[in-house]
From Swiss-Prot:
Its EC number is 2.4.1.198. GO terms for molecular function: phosphatidylinositol N-acetylglucosaminyltransferase activity. The keyword Transferase applies. This is Phosphatidylinositol N-acetylglucosaminyltransferase gpi3 subunit.
Amino acid sequence: MVSDFFFPQPGGIESHIFQLSQRLIDLGHKVIVITHAYKDRVGVRYLTNGLTVYYVPLHTVYRETTFPSFFSFFPIFRNIVIRENIEIVHGHGSLSFLCHDAILHARTMGLKTCFTDHSLFGFADAGSIVTNKLLKFTMSDVNHVICVSHTCRENTVLRAVLNPKRVSVIPNALVAENFQPDPSKASKDFLTIVVISRLYYNKGIDLLIAVIPRICAQHPKVRFVIAGDGPKSIDLEQMREKYMLQDRVEMLGSVRHDQVRDVMVRGHIYLHPSLTEAFGTVLVEAASCGLYVISTKVGGVPEVLPSHMTRFARPEEDDLADTLSSVITDYLDHKIKTETFHEEVKQMYSWIDVAERTEKVYDSICSENNLRLIDRLKLYYGCGQWAGKLFCLLIAIDYLVMVLLEWIWPASDIDPAVDRVSSTFKISKQNFDESLVLTDPKKKTKIKTACLKDAQ
């Protein structure tokens, strides 16, 4: 698994990679994760079930994405892949340059590749044009592509000019046991609306800023709980100050993923004002916690939950405010029942199912033959009149770099890594102490604390 987005940063892609890796390990596969360093988290870390994570010291430029390195990442990537005896490289995220680099190097080394797209992009603005061209470059020689929704699949096929037969739809999921409802935590005096999101423009925070004062004026018994961080947090604070809503709009800042459920069970309604969304795992988590979901009707959101669990609004201030006001009235009149939501969601979404479907994709690409270099160059040449020639040059240089690395540091000289996936890493409350063969109680306590911190 390769992506710029992984723990300790919270988010949907991060959670997807971790949970999918855990379930694949349970199915008997060896899985490692390659990501960039996060502050002092550098080097190799071992997480739950012996999941090995390589935090590579690379510089980030924007929203935790690394600067495109192309060839400078190749030596360490090659070393990791050979050490761990990797056969399939699975990248995540269109905006992850680390993912794109890894897929290109993996194909040069003759490895099988898979890519999962978690986002939707347009076709008109400059940022989308550059991203789409980069995606087309990388996807020209990828073995298979996975999308998290049918809307995302259509978007990715158009952006990367892919054969639809090479693109599958496998949704996100959740661990339902970690998102159980608790009605006793919700306020009896107020109707609480929860928002958990990164506070960026594309997440619809401007809509949220416009809607909150209107709803608070119309419904005196409503309050908001907002969790998340980002550049729009300043605008939210200013809105709170302007309308004097400090006692009705609570801002929690960034929360860890293991704290999301504790925030959700404080509410009755979950509001999701995003302007673009490929799937929206947080919607499933909210419904599992027994919250009624209100969301903008964008992207793959309509595919996520059945109609009795959610209500949609256009991504406009007036329509979102009217829809939210209508749901609040229905909720106060006891017309909305959420008692069965958790069991329904538990039956609909499972990481085991996601892992088994992903495993079938892996099996299918393992039977494919690797292309010769000349055939790969033909695929890249079709990426555009000028871009095609540039991409061919990059691939040719990448091949020469691989030959040079093999001459300087032959694969036979790279020591294989120890297989860490064993029962001693399957830590539970009952057998944790027994899994650590240490005689010093003080050292055992320190290691226990460190391991639990990493596992979180």
